């Protein structure tokens, strides 16, 4: 295929596993990022993302201390889903302030992770990889697992897209049609948790929100339709990720920060393009505005 030939000519074979992981992460981030920006739960996503470090640290410690066959990816997915369910239930059932819950979980998750990783002989390198991303250490087993997670996200959203739109824009409609708001809200948080685990391999724990939020914010400037926003955000993620991997490889830099800088540059460019946008076109949609499906 022409596209594969182009990629083979541009990227060395060593980077192909990293490119596959970045492609899957870009699709997941473009899809889920669109919902969390419109639903205004970016801060919750940040809490889930940072709490991953706790699961990663526990998995690495168990692996080192007891020689258990536990991957950091397994610890990350378990902690992310657990935190997502906890945040959702506390918010919906007890109506506690979200900012208080987020602050508590954010700090506890990071603290547990740092304590566990500090007990490892390779503390600095492991911590740097998970905080700032190092997609070059993706193994074939991790790649298969990431592919399964990505397919699950795409399949679930394809089936439940209408319900998620109603959750984001019209919860009264869901209640009138006897749909469980709690169930769909928790499902969205779980999908967000899975997405953050996928992004951990590309961006690291600290910088993954830039891949979730910035491309969606750019797309929202130029389209009303939710489906268009998802497509644009996914394409922007793919372009910035591939370019970031190549630049990081050539310049011997960490991948996550390079991609984050490219995302920031793309967002700044969108601000300039916004000024030259056709004046007769209605104002682009904002994350808070109602978006059509």
Curated annotation (Swiss-Prot):
Gene3D superfamilies: ABC transporter involved in vitamin B12 uptake, BtuC. It is a multi-pass membrane protein. The chain crosses the membrane at residues 18-38, 41-61, 68-88, 101-121, 135-155, 187-207, 242-262. InterPro entries: ABC_BtuC-like, ABC_TroCD. Its main location: membrane. It is found in: Cell inner membrane. GO terms for cellular component: ATP-binding cassette (ABC) transporter complex; plasma membrane. It holds the Pfam family ABC-3. Keywords: Cell inner membrane, Cell membrane, Membrane, Transmembrane, Transmembrane helix, Transport. One of its GO terms (biological process) is transmembrane transport. Belongs to the ABC-3 integral membrane protein family. Part of an ATP-driven transport system CT_415/CT_416/CT_417 for a metal. PANTHER family: ABC-TRANSPORTER METAL-BINDING PROTEIN (PTHR30477), METAL TRANSPORT SYSTEM MEMBRANE PROTEIN CT_417-RELATED (PTHR30477:SF18). This is Probable metal transport system membrane protein CT_417. It comes from Chlamydia trachomatis serovar D (strain ATCC VR-885 / DSM 19411 / UW-3/Cx). The lineage of its organism: Bacteria, Pseudomonadati, Chlamydiota, Chlamydiia, Chlamydiales.
């Amino acid at each position: 295929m022409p596209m594969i030939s182009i990629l083979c000519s541009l990227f060395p074979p060593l980077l192909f596993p990293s490119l596959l992981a970045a492609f899957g992460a870009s699709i997941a981030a473009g899809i889920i990022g669109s919902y969390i920006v419109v639903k205004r739960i970016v801060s919750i996503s940040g809490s889930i993302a940072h709490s991953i470090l706790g699961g990663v640290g526990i998995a690495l410690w168990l692996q080192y201390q007891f020689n258990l066959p536990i991957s950091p990816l397994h610890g990350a997915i378990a902690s992310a889903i657990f935190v997502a369910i906890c945040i959702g239930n506390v918010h919906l059932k007890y109506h506690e302030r979200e900012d208080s819950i987020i602050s508590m979980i954010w700090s506890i998750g990071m603290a547990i992770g740092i304590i566990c990783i500090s007990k490892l002989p390779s503390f600095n390198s492991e911590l740097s990889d998970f905080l700032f991303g190092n997609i070059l250490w993706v193994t074939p087993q991790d790649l298969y697992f990431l592919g399964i997670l990505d397919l699950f996200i795409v399949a679930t959203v394809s089936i439940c897209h209408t319900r998620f739109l109603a959750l984001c824009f019209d919860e009264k409609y869901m209640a009138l049609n006897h749909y469980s708001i709690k169930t769909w809200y928790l499902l969205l948080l779980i999908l967000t948790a899975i997405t953050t685990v996928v992004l951990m391999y590309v961006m690291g724990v600290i910088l993954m929100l830039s891949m979730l939020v910035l491309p969606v914010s750019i797309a929202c400037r130029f389209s009303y339709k939710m489906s268009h926003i998802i497509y644009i955000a996914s394409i922007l993620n793919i372009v910035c990720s591939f370019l970031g991997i190549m630049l990081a490889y050539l310049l011997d830099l960490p991948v996550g920060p390079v991609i984050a800088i490219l995302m920031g540059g793309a967002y700044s460019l969108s601000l300039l393009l916004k000024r030259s946008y056709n004046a007769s076109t209605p104002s682009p949609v904002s994350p808070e505005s109602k978006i059509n499906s």
